[in-house]
């Protein structure tokens, strides 16, 4: 049920903004913000503009002006048209209806009230402002708009402490060219510096066409003191679910491990995982991470009426890209669509099963707290195990590919979530 339309969302929400499918042709994703030069008027969307494959990081400082997608339309008309085609993805699903355990599992945070599916990059500002959930700080705009990305690059951590409304007044468009290209037009640039900070020297070990997507399709948290968007690792080796959980458990805030929220009935200090597509795809067990970038699968090469080739910026599932399926995927897969759907069905089955187990654990722990029959030490022991169980489940639930990006990692996370939930159940009197 969750995302019966997942094959589209896997592309629209999961992994996007990248470079080329054919690494020798046409423009792709981000680049460092230079002073905005007026874009050229001719549609120079040819191989001469192929970006270098070395990771670039945005130059921060004052005087940053964002060039909008429309500003680039004259130079890249076909790419611009393909970008606007993302507007067709209008449907929103409320996950709290599709997954009835969510209001219990997420109790204590806004997602328990409404959890809408993402509609893609052209709707990010509209979606974050119309959730019905209160937003205090501007950091909610991280990865929602190039305007806020530029604010952070110009102001530093001070931008994270702006109010939501003050930032909104300065926002003009949803995710667009600057997020992945800065103001360069066709080069790939890491414009979200927290990714570069977290990757360290490993930044150069990942293709820029994957880094472009990995800027936003990641697990992150807001640092308690600065409210800055922060990734919970230091390199590729510490980007695993186990290491990330350990990071959070070792990050002490007011004498207790970091938490995104606390369940009001159980007292469990919960971690709310975001959308760890980057960590999942780059993780152990990933079959394609060393061969294909995010863009290779989700941004196909297209041909304009005049014969010009360009990279489509309509983010789709690779299963919807007939040329990719026939010319590339078929070399190894005889029935990739059937294989992917089988993986997704099994992942969904287990996600529901473990989710209901966590719902039952939450209710049982709430009763234990209310009963007064347990010492605080006993309750804290159960809470610690329940916290870890939910983390592993959430890592899969919110990743958006239903196991397609890395079924081995997702299966391992669900195994751990199930084992920990059962362990916690066994701790009751």
Predicted ranges, named:
Residues 1-4:
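Positively charged n-region of N-terminal signal peptides that target proteins for export
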Residues 6-13:
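Sec-dependent N-terminal signal peptides
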Residues 24-118, 153-174, 179, 184-296, ...:
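Primarily the internal scaffold of c-type cytochrome electron-transfer domains
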Residues 103, 108-129, 136, 146:
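Long, composition-driven intrinsically disordered regions
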Residues 143, 152:
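Glycine-rich active-site/cofactor-binding loop and its immediate structural neighborhood
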């Amino acid at each position: 049920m969750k995302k019966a339309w997942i094959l589209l969302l896997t592309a629209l929400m999961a992994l996007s903004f990248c470079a080329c499918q054919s690494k020798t042709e046409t423009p792709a994703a981000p680049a460092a913000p230079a002073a905005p030069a007026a874009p050229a008027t001719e549609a120079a969307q040819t191989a001469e503009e192929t970006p270098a494959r070395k990771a670039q990081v945005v130059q921060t400082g004052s005087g940053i002006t964002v060039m909008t997608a429309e500003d680039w339309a004259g130079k890249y008309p076909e790419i611009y048209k393909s970008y606007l085609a993302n507007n067709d993805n209008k449907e929103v699903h409320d996950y709290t209806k599709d997954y009835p355990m969510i209001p219990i599992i997420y109790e204590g945070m806004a997602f328990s009230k409404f959890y809408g599916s993402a509609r893609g990059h052209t709707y990010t500002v509209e979606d974050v402002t119309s959730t019905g959930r209160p937003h205090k700080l501007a950091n909610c705009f991280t990865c929602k708009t190039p305007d806020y990305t530029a604010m952070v690059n110009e102001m530093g951590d001070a931008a994270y402490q702006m109010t939501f409304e003050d930032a909104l007044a300065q926002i003009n468009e949803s995710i667009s060219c600057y997020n992945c290209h800065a103001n360069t037009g066709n080069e790939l640039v890491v414009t979200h510096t927290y990714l570069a900070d977290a990757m360290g020297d490993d930044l150069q070990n990942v293709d820029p066409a994957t880094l472009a997507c990995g800027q936003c399709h990641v697990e992150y948290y807001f640092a308690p003191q600065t409210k800055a968007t922060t990734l919970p690792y230091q390199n590729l080796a510490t980007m695993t679910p186990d290491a990330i959980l350990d990071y959070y458990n070792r990050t002490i805030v007011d004498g207790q491990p970091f938490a995104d929220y606390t369940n009001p009935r159980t007292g469990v200090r919960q971690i709310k995982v975001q959308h760890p597509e980057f960590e999942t795809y780059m993780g152990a067990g990933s079959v394609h991470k060393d061969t294909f970038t995010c863009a290779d699968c989700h941004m196909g090469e297209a041909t304009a009426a005049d014969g010009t080739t360009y990279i489509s910026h309509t983010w789709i599932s690779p299963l919807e890209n007939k040329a990719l399926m026939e010319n590339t995927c078929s070399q190894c897969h005889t029935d990739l669509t059937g294989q992917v759907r089988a993986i997704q069905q099994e992942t969904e089955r287990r996600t529901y099963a473990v989710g209901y187990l966590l719902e039952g654990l939450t209710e049982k722990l709430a009763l234990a707290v209310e009963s007064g029959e347990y010492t605080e030490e006993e309750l804290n022991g159960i809470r610690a195990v329940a916290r870890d169980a939910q983390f592993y489940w959430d890592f899969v639930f919110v990743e958006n590919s239903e196991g397609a990006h890395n079924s081995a990692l997702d299966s391992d996370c669900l195994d751990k979530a199930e084992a920990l939930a059962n362990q916690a159940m066994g701790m009751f009197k």
